[in-house]
Amino acid sequence: MISAQNLVYSLQGRRLTDNVSLTFPGGEIVAILGPNGAGKSTLLRQLTGYLQPDSGECRLFNKPLNEWSITELAKHRAVMRQNSHMAFPFSVQEVIQMGRHPHRTGNQDNETAQIMALCDCQALANRDYRQLSGGEQQRVQLARLLVQLWEPTPSPKWLFLDEPTSALDIHHQQHLFRLLRQLVHERQFNVCCVLHDLNLAARYADRIVLMQKGKVIANGKPQDVLTQQELTMLYGADITVLEDPANHSPLIVLDH
């Protein structure tokens, strides 16, 4: 379980998180949504321990994040940031193997190959990471996170992903979320991601957190949160919310 209690963080006089309290029990995919500048990435950084709030605290398994050692925390949770640029000419395989840093031993070759296959990275193995497209880099970074968390213990695991589909084509967006669901159901993974694509969130997330101006304004199941009234008020866009006939999730359509 991950919990946040009364998180406040300000920068240059502006509150990026404003008294945020949340509890994620686990066993689900959580999507954090909101307009630009709502505080989504700031909240994600606080939930992962990369950013200390001005007040309030985050806990993992009821233990404050600031009481975890860096190594032990890295065995429980892994984080994909929006930008993962590298200055040095590492190969894709070397980047993926960096996920083993918190552990004393390297992956078995078959485990690394399995993870690269899951993330569709096999053909990229010997490429210079810096020469990859944005979408290819996102797939490689996901593979690195899975290498980091692939050990069966400790368990459960948490994946935090900041806009993981921003550069992916539609095939790899679908592949990513199918894989995340598989990890949740089969390997005791928990997923928390920041997204801008409302329909991806509606289709694949179990829980939606809506943010506006540093505050959480809604938190619940997609069909309860992604309503036409709520989204029109939040985004100021002309939209229609329908029901997806395939799975009865909300389907958000931009009006002409």
Curated annotation (Swiss-Prot):
Sorted keywords for this record are: ATP-binding, Cell inner membrane, Cell membrane, Membrane, Nucleotide-binding, Translocase, Transport
Record's function text: Part of the ABC transporter complex HmuTUV involved in hemin import. Responsible for energy coupling to the transport system.
List the protein's name: Hemin import ATP-binding protein HmuV
This chain is encoded by the gene named hmuV
Per the UniProt record, which EC number(s) apply here? Answer: 7.6.2.-
List, alphabetically, the CDD domains matched.
Answer: ABC_Iron-Siderophores_B12_Hemin
Q: Name one GO molecular function term.
A: ATP hydrolysis activity
Q: Which residues cross the membrane?
A: none
Give the enzyme's main class according to its UniProt record, as a single word.
translocase
| UniProt record similarity statement | Belongs to the ABC transporter superfamily. Heme (hemin) importer (TC 3.A.1.14.5) family.
What binding partners and quaternary form does the record give?
The complex is composed of two ATP-binding proteins (HmuV), two transmembrane proteins (HmuU) and a solute-binding protein (HmuT).
- List the Pfam families: ABC_tran
Indicate which residues the UniProt annotation says bind ATP.
G34, P35, N36, G37, A38, G39, K40, S41
Give the source lineage, highest ranks first.
Bacteria, Pseudomonadati, Pseudomonadota, Gammaproteobacteria, Enterobacterales
Please provide, in alphabetical order, the Gene Ontology terms of the cellular component aspect for this entry.
Answer: plasma membrane
